[in-house]
């Protein structure tokens, strides 16, 4: 098995891989441990992993505990100043710290950071489309600038950054940022080789829940064309992948985080396990020889 992975191990040496950590992988203890081990494995073989995480389930749980209403509109959490206090506390103080601890059980690799630290992210308020109307749902933001100087110092020192997606605005407010969006923006800004997004499904279904509509490879223009019709929960994930490959990332992957070691299975095996999004002008020689695409988008859409 390891000998078969050699072309991929060589390919990812000294390359940055941004992983958006979410879904079941961040609530199941055995999956959390497997994910942490995957990050250490990548670092040990010479890749440069960077983790970006959300914390939806943990935030909802804490809001319930303190008696606050957790409300979503247009797929985004309504973020009042009171909710923002909880978001900030849970993301950086709980979810991020837990993952840093799991990774560091293997050695002193991980460092927790956030979009607020050393100006990593700058945000502005995001209006959310609800039935065609741009709507203010509180302290929800879009990233308008990435300054990765301090993050690159961590990466170059051999650390694994674990990034919480909260960010200051020029207006002095702190904003809650969708973690899928943040991961894509960061991957482009730091010249990542790959972006991986963990989900609770096998990959991209073009006609959810029709199992035969799962695709292994899709190029940016094909994804752009079908994006508005995708399942609502999948749109921010696929939009992040699309923006990443259009921003210079060689490929973006949506993978099933319910499978232990899904990151390694996707990156270091011939066919991978999820969906790979490629730039329109991708060159076959930029990807390890032996890479197999199980089902192209065109296969079902001649």
UniProtKB/Swiss-Prot annotation:
Site: Transition state stabilizer. Where?
Answer: 20, 237
- Subcellular location(s) of the protein: Cytoplasm
Q: Which Pfam families match?
A: AA_kinase
User: What keywords does the record list, in alphabetical order?
Assistant: Amino-acid biosynthesis, Arginine biosynthesis, ATP-binding, Cytoplasm, Kinase, Nucleotide-binding, Transferase
Q: Does the keyword ATP-binding apply?
A: yes
Q: In which pathway does it act?
A: Amino-acid biosynthesis; L-arginine biosynthesis; N(2)-acetyl-L-ornithine from L-glutamate: step 2/4
- Return the GO cellular component terms, semicolon-separated: cytoplasm
Q: Using the chain's own numbering, where are the disulfide bonds?
A: none
Reactions that this protein is recorded to catalyse? N-acetyl-L-glutamate + ATP = N-acetyl-L-glutamyl 5-phosphate + ADP
Q: Does the keyword Transferase apply?
A: yes
**What top-level class of enzyme does the UniProt entry assign?**
transferase
User: Which GO biological-process labels does this protein carry?
Assistant: arginine biosynthetic process via ornithine; L-arginine biosynthetic process
| Residues given in the record as substrate binding sites | 55-56, 77, 176
- Give the InterPro entries listed for this entry: AceGlu_kinase-like_sf (IPR036393), AcgluKinase_fam (IPR004662), ArgB (IPR037528), Asp/Glu/Uridylate_kinase (IPR001048), Glu/AcGlu_kinase (IPR001057), NAGK-C (IPR041727)
| Documented EC number(s) | 2.7.2.8
Q: Name one GO molecular function term.
A: acetylglutamate kinase activity
> Its family?
Belongs to the acetylglutamate kinase family. ArgB subfamily.
Q: What does this protein do?
A: Catalyzes the ATP-dependent phosphorylation of N-acetyl-L-glutamate.
Q: What is this protein called?
A: Acetylglutamate kinase
Question: Which species is this UniProt entry from?
Answer: Corynebacterium efficiens (strain DSM 44549 / YS-314 / AJ 12310 / JCM 11189 / NBRC 100395)
The taxonomic lineage of its organism, from the top, reads: Bacteria, Bacillati, Actinomycetota, Actinomycetes, Mycobacteriales
This protein's gene is called argB
């Amino acid at each position: 098995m390891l000998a078969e992975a050699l072309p991929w191990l060589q390919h990812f040496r000294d390359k940055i891989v941004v992983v958006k950590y979410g879904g079941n992988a961040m609530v199941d203890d055995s999956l959390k441990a497997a994910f942490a081990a995957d990050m250490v494995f990548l670092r040990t073989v010479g890749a440069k992993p960077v983790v970006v995480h959300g914390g939806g389930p943990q935030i909802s749980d804490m809001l319930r505990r303190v008696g606050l209403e957790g409300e979503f509109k247009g797929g985004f959490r309504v973020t009042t100043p009171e909710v923002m206090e909880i978001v900030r506390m849970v993301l950086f103080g709980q979810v991020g710290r837990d993952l840093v601890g799991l990774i560091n059980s293997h050695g002193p690799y991980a460092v927790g950071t956030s979009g607020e630290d050393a100006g990593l992210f700058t945000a502005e308020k995001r209006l959310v489309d609800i039935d065609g109307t741009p709507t203010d749902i509180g302290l929800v933001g879009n990233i308008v600038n990435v300054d990765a100087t301090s993050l690159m110092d961590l990466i170059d020192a051999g650390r694994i950054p674990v990034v919480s997606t909260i960010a200051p605005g020029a207006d002095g407010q702190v904003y809650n940022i969708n973690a899928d969006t943040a991961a894509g923006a960061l991957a482009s800004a730091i010249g990542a080789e790959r972006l991986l997004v963990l989900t609770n499904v096998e990959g991209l279904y073009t006609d959810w829940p029709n199992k035969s509509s799962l695709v292994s490879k899709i190029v940016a223009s094909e994804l752009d064309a079908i994006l508005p019709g995708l399942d609502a929960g999948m749109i921010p994930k696929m939009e992040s992948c699309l923006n990443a490959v259009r921003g210079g990332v060689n490929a973006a992957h949506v993978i099933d985080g319910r499978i232990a070691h899904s990151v390694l299975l996707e990156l270091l095996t011939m066919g991978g396990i999820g969906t790979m999004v490629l730039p329109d002008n991708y060159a076959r020689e930029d990807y390890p020889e032996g890479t197999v695409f199980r089902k192209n988008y065109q296969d079902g859409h001649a």
